[in-house]
Design a protein with these regions (language model features):
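Extended, low-hydrophobicity, Ser/Thr/Pro/Gly-biased non-transmembrane segments
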Residues: 1-59
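Alpha-helical structural motif
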Residues: 6-8, 39-50, 54-57, 92-99, ...
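Short loop segments at secondary-structure junctions
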Residues: 17-19, 135-136, 184
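Short secondary-structure junctions and interdomain/linker hinges
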Residues: 19, 50-52, 86, 106-110, ...
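Acidic/polar loop patches that form or flank catalytic/metal-binding clefts of enzymes
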Residues: 20-25, 109-115, 165-166, 188-197
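Secretory-pathway/luminal and periplasmic proteins that interact with or process carbohydrate-rich
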Residues: 51, 124-129, 184-191
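Acidic/His/Gly-enriched intrinsically disordered linker/tail segments
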Residues: 174, 178-234
Length: 234
């Protein structure tokens, strides 16, 4: 099943060969060496989460790992990317610690084993401990990246914990996640930062939402053709 309502815990056991290794969700349990360069790597994810945000990442990842001192204790952090892309990724995640502080300040303690992001070929998704993060963003400005990784981090409260009952109420997780980026700007630049983020967002929505989504749409219930549109995500 693949839904917002069903929740489960997970065990991952993935066999791979060559330079490819599982970088999984949750806690690393170990690696079993098989014949040649084949291994089985195992992870356990013990917090119940909606089934649509369970995934595996398998490649020749290089890992940057460190610990952030959060408001409620230490928060392990991992950034994973192909070796050639890791430095560019790290250079654009300079304010991730600030985003963690903002989320814990407004939403409460971070509830998962680590904060983690993995570069992918396309798209972003709030996979807990292994957020899928588009590689193209490593060529974008620091501020654009800050908005996106803050959005995805906000989902670890709004989406991974608080979840809509049906896809037509997607606003319930996307609205607060997007606003998380605004709160991060406030943390960095004060009231002026928040006001600019909110006003820029409002102007974009007023100009573009009805153009992009075939007219003005109600947030709830959002018609199926426009669930992943501008109204929902901005």
């Amino acid at each position: 099943f693949d839904s917002f309502v069903e929740r489960a815990t997970y065990g991952y056991h993935v066999k791979s060969a060559g330079t490819y290794r599982l970088h999984g969700q949750g806690t690393f349990l170990g690696e079993q060496q098989l014949a040649g360069d084949t291994v089985i790597r195992s992870y356990a994810f013990d917090q119940p989460i909606p089934t649509y945000i369970s995934a595996v990442a398998i490649s020749d990842y290089a890992i940057h790992a460190y610990t952030h001192n959060g408001a409620y204790g230490e928060v392990p952090v991992t950034l994973a990317a192909k070796p050639a892309n890791l430095n560019a990724m790290m250079a654009r995640f300079l304010d991730l610690g600030t985003a963690i502080d903002v989320c814990e300040h407004w939403y409460g303690p971070y509830g998962f084993d680590r904060v983690g992001y993995v570069l992918t070929t396309d798209g972003a998704l709030e996979i807990p401990t292994n957020v899928a993060y588009p590689q193209l963003m490593t060529g974008q400005p620091v501020s654009s990246n800050r908005g996106l990784y803050s959005h995805e981090l906000g989902h670890h409260w709004w989406g991974c914990v608080v979840t809509p009952d049906i896809h037509n109420n997607m606003w319930l997780k996307e609205g607060p996640a997007e606003y998380t980026g605004h709160l991060v700007e406030e943390w960095i630049d004060g009231a002026a930062g928040l006001q600019k983020a909110v006003k820029d967002n409002l102007l974009f929505v007023l100009r573009q939402a009805h153009v992009n989504d075939d007219g003005f749409q109600a947030l709830s219930p959002m018609p199926d053709p426009h669930i992943y549109g501008t109204h929902t995500y901005y």
